[in-house]
Amino acid sequence: MSASRAVLPFALLCLTACATKPPYQARLADTQADCVERFESVRRHPLAVLDAKSRAKAPYVEFADVAQCLRTAQGSTALALYAIDEASRPAQVDISILPSPGGTFAASAELLDARFQRIERHSFAEFTRRGGEYSLSLFLDRAGPVYLMLVPDQDQVGKQESMIGSVNNQMMVPAGPVMFAVNHGAETQTIRAFMAGGRLKVTMRPEGSAAFSH
């Protein structure tokens, strides 16, 4: 057998394996290791105003990758803490959650002051289903909050949404000199679980600018 013939089956096998990507599965943040016991010690992510092009290019990230464990007297919880650029105000923060059959992050958003005291809280029920994502926009005035905190909304974690769709298939059937098209339609149902993890994106824009550009 020539070398080219020997390599061909291997190449086809590799191509098939590389093209087969496992389905997405949301990861949960670790609430056992790397825990801190004070808000001041929680890792912070800077949040500043971006132009429209930069906001559109901003990637979705796993909550587990941006969250850290905070241990309190009530127990341990995973949270993502964003430090808001005060010089950029007034502005608006846009939070986007990407739904997936592998897990949708049921997020609760809280705005905190400089002492990490809650100013306002928004449950996952306040997020709006807009196109292919859940979204929430928060207005920040000049004397507004210093931090944005995202945590799992325990009232929604464990629930699920059901999406109904349809699939249409067409098959061409020969009948002598002509062809007939046979159409077959079927209803589909997609179940998406609300979890304590999933993909999200947080951006900040100038006040009055368009919120979401896709």
Model-found features: residue ranges?
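Bacterial N-terminal signal peptides that target proteins for export
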Residues: 1-8
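C-terminal motif of bacterial Sec signal peptides marking the signal peptidase cleavage site
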Residues: 15-17
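Bacterial signal peptide processing site
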Residues: 19-21
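C-terminal edge strands of extracellular/lumenal beta-sandwich accessory domains
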Residues: 23-66, 153-214
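Non-catalytic, beta-strand-enriched accessory regions in extracellular/secretory proteins
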Residues: 61-87, 133
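Noncatalytic modules at the cell exterior or secretory-pathway interfaces
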Residues: 89-93, 139-161
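Short coil-to-beta strand junction motifs in C2/discoidin
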Residues: 101-107
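Solvent-exposed serine/threonine-rich low-complexity stretches and specific carbohydrate-binding patches
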Residues: 120-129
